[in-house]
Design a protein with these regions (language model features):
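Serine-hydrolase catalytic core recognition
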Residues: 476-787
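Beta-propeller folds
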Residues: 5-13, 19-478, 486-487, 495-499, ...
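Intrinsically disordered, low-complexity N-terminal regions enriched in serine/proline/glycine
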Residues: 17, 55-56, 150, 376, ...
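Extended, C-terminal/distal alpha-helical "rod" segments
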Residues: 3-4, 614
Length: 787
């Protein structure tokens, strides 16, 4: 269905949500919180068979943590489990040679090549190492990485291609040492022995260089660095290396107690450090010529704005010294930011550089001959650069770069050819998951163009032109092009449909569903369909998208108690049309409606899917705009859905737990009860990467931390609070809730309780814990919202 066609139905004043059919058993709390195996497994990942005749996908095995591989033909037929023997001839996600004759893939850490004409499979490696980063070159050769080293295959033999090492070269000149020089001058035997060693070394190296059967010598970066990452050109000529200072201090890490163990003794795990204890270590970028071993550092001086300090005012106010020289940077290496991308011909390489202060991102190319950077694009954000939408790459012509940028306020796709820049997508919607066609003439990508909550596969010409929506599935998760480029394997979902597979022509058109892994029991339930709503903002935020759950036919004159749900992560979208991350909570909301509540789940400011300004609304003051949005949502429920303002509750986990604390502490009396699950109560206790983006460094911006941390406002608690937290949570430490507990004790607060879960981490995995937690939440609401 198309969202545009449904807009009036979905957003009409009368709710489209319905109560359960009396003939259908109402979901119980035990069932909602049970092991989700009863629902049926979601399609975890999917990829094409090498000839495009079938799709492989992964499903969790019932009653186990094992993921089995299944196969389904694209022309129909029942899905089948891939046998143990069948797995030996199965390709995983492959990279296709430039000419389209062969593909390469990694299975169980080993490298394989498939002839796409004959189907012949050739195994290139057989070891216990883990290969990664496969790439073809224009000569039909293949390169890949294993650990720090690189390997190549030229069609005949697998050979070492490059070996970066964090040590000094054997012929490196030693530091000046007067005593050593004195000894060599006086003792001729010492000098003669030294000369012989050097002559042997030089001769050995000369023989190595003259012998094409020998691998290149290791590339020495020096003993004062630690190698973070490296990237080899497809032709094997050049190696980019990312380093940091040896022994760089990452800050004091935590020791997290584990109380319930197999050994019977309390144990301790190493855990992360806290925000601001030490900034991420600055990194350097080097260019090495593989054949000669010559290494040159790539200077960052040329980057526009590299010496500017966006935090100068805060630094001055905090009494800190002004920033001197270049701002410290980190190099994209495939974690939060993509690794360097080489063109297939090996002549071009692009790299993402990101300022440690989170305010700038540079896309650069490298002049390989002169070992200099060439700035191609700078993205600056007064708040912080998004950790999403940093994708980039090359088109097959080897000279056109593509990249994503939020510079317009929304993530969009751009191309760069020389100095000519073109914007391929535009509008108040987001572009993501970009895949160029194999011939480089088109881009395929996800877009939420029809509505922020509706995700489809779209395409556009690489030269610019109209954007087309190729699917009409509303909840596309991801997709992959067929080996021939004529079809799309689409993973999609819906409110009560875990991710499934469908097939769509690459030109668009109707889809054909290939899988439905839901159980008969789950499908038999007549679930309450969420109503996708737009809540008017009274605080200049336009509208706030959300999901409303309520009775199909409200009783005239009746006021309904209210429950408001707050999703986690902050930057996450939960009011979209996908299968929710919070599927258990969605079933709980069904139960709440059956018990007489109405429920609203909002994508508050800070959520994903609504552009840069929505994302950064919380900069330097987490909790303020989100609470405004929830109070607007409360007003809307009272005005539009017979909500009882005097009997409203709120709950959520992680960021949702933080917001529950914020609501109860800073808006006392608005919510009569709240359940804060695994909450952040003090942002000084959270990690650096997430927190410093939004609140800066605590030494520079202490006010941002004070006004954003609920523990600072705990004196405001007057309503009923449940805190629930896993004791081995290595994301939001259980200690955070312990400190809040102590603060509430010191403040002589009552009407609160804490429930610890000794064997749970940030995301609960045991059904018993889920049930206990949500039984407590349900009892909290029943006791305080219906009186």
């Amino acid at each position: 269905m198309r969202f545009a066609a449904l807009a009036l139905a979905l957003l009409a004043t009368q709710p489209v949500a319905h109560a359960a059919d009396p003939a259908t058993p109402t979901v119980t709390l035990e069932q909602a919180m049970a092991d989700p195996d009863w629902i049926g497994p979601a399609v975890d990942a999917a990829w094409w068979r090498w000839d495009g005749s079938a799709a492989y996908y992964m499903l969790k095995r019932k009653g186990a943590n094992i993921r089995d591989i299944w196969q389904v033909g694209i022309d129909g037929g029942a899905p089948a489990l891939v046998s143990d023997a069948g797995r030996t001839d199965m390709d995983t996600a492959a990279v296709i040679e430039f000419g389209g004759a062969r593909s390469a893939f990694i299975r169980n850490g080993n490298v394989f090549v498939r002839d796409l004409h004959s189907g012949t499979l050739t195994q290139l490696t057989r070891d216990n190492q883990a290969a990664e980063r496969l790439q073809w070159n224009r000569s039909g050769g293949l390169i890949w990485q294993v650990g720090a080293d690189w390997y190549r295959w030229d069609g005949r033999v697998v050979a070492t291609a490059a070996q970066p090492r964090a040590d000094d070269a054997p012929d490196a000149k030693p530091p000046v040492d007067d005593l050593r020089d004195h000894q060599l001058r006086l003792i001729s035997t010492l000098a003669d022995d030294k000369a012989r060693r050097e002559a042997m070394r030089d001769q050995t190296e000369a023989w190595r260089r003259a012998d094409p059967t020998r691998p290149p010598a290791p590339i020495h970066l020096g003993k004062d660095v630690t190698i973070v990452d490296s990237s080899l050109s497809p032709d094997g000529r050049w190696l980019l290396v990312v380093t940091t200072a040896k022994g760089a201090d990452g800050g004091r890490g935590e020791k997290m107690p584990v109380p319930v163990t197999e050994s019977g003794y309390e144990e301790f795990e190493d855990a992360r450090s806290l925000v601001g204890r030490n900034d991420p270590s600055p990194q350097r970028l080097w260019l090495a010529e593989v054949a000669t071993g010559k290494v040159r550092e790539l200077s960052f001086d040329i980057l526009p704005g590299i010496k500017d300090d966006p935090l100068a005012a805060l630094r001055k106010a905090a009494g800190k010294d002004p920033l001197k020289g270049n701002r410290p940077l980190q190099v994209g290496s495939g974690d939060d930011v993509p690794a360097p991308q080489w063109s297939d011909d090996g002549h071009g390489v692009a790299v993402i550089l990101r300022a440690v202060d989170n305010k700038d991102r540079w896309l650069v190319t490298v002049d390989l001959a002169n070992a200099t950077l060439q700035p191609r694009h700078r993205l600056h954000d007064e708040a912080w650069i998004n950790w999403s939408f940093n994708d980039f790459g090359w088109l097959p012509d080897g000279s056109t770069l593509w990249y994503l940028s939020e510079e317009s306020g929304f993530s969009h796709l751009y191309t760069l050819r020389g100095n000519q820049r073109s914007q391929i997508t535009d509008g108040h919607w987001e572009t993501s998951q970009v895949t160029p066609s194999r011939d480089g003439t088109r881009f395929y990508f996800l877009c939420n163009r029809a509505a922020p909550i509706d995700y489809e596969v779209c395409d556009a010409p690489a030269s610019g032109g109209a954007v087309r929506e190729l699917t009409a599935l509303d909840g596309v998760e991801d997709f992959s092009l067929s080996p021939k480029g004529d079809a799309l394997l689409v993973r999609h979902s819906a409110a009560y449909l875990p991710p499934q597979l469908s097939l769509v022509s690459a030109q668009g058109g109707p889809s054909r569903q290939l899988t439905d892994t839901r159980s008969a029991e789950f499908k038999a339930h007549r679930w309450i369909q969420p109503q996708y709503v737009q809540v008017p903002s009274k605080h200049g935020a336009s509208v706030i998208w959300g999901k409303y759950y309520g009775p199909a036919n409200p009783e005239p004159g009746r006021k309904y108690p209210i429950v408001m749900f707050v999703h986690g992560a902050g930057y996450l979208q939960n009011a979209d049309m996908h299968w929710p991350d919070y599927f258990r909570e969605q079933m709980f909301h069904n139960l709440l409606v059956d018990e007489g509540y109405i429920v609203l789940d909002l994508d508050y400011r800070a959520s994903q899917g609504y552009g840069r300004d929505w994302r950064t609304a919380i900069y330097r003051w987490m909790g303020k705009p989100e609470l405004e949005d929830y109070r607007d949502g409360l007003d809307w429920l009272v005005d539009q859905h017979q909500g009882d303002r005097d009997h409203a509750g709120i709950y959520g986990g992680s960021y949702g737990g933080f917001m529950t604390l914020t609501a109860l502490f800073q808006a006392p009396g608005v919510f009569k009860a709240g359940a804060a699950l695994r909450p952040v109560s003090d942002w000084m206790q959270y990690n650096h990467g997430y927190t410093s983006n939004i609140l800066n460094d605590p030494e520079l911006d202490p006010e941002a931390y004070r006004r954003s941390s609920p523990i600072e406002f705990a004196s405001g608690l007057q309503d009923h609070l449940l805190i629930a937290h896993g004791m081995i949570d290595d994301n939001v430490f259980f200690r955070d809730s312990i400190q809040l507990t102590q603060r509430l004790i010191e403040l002589h607060k009552d009407h609160w309780q804490i429930a610890p879960y000794p064997m749970e981490r940030h995301g609960f995995i045991h059904a018993d814990s889920w049930l206990d937690e949500y039984r407590r939440i349900n009892e909290l609401f029943e006791a305080n919202l219906k009186r």
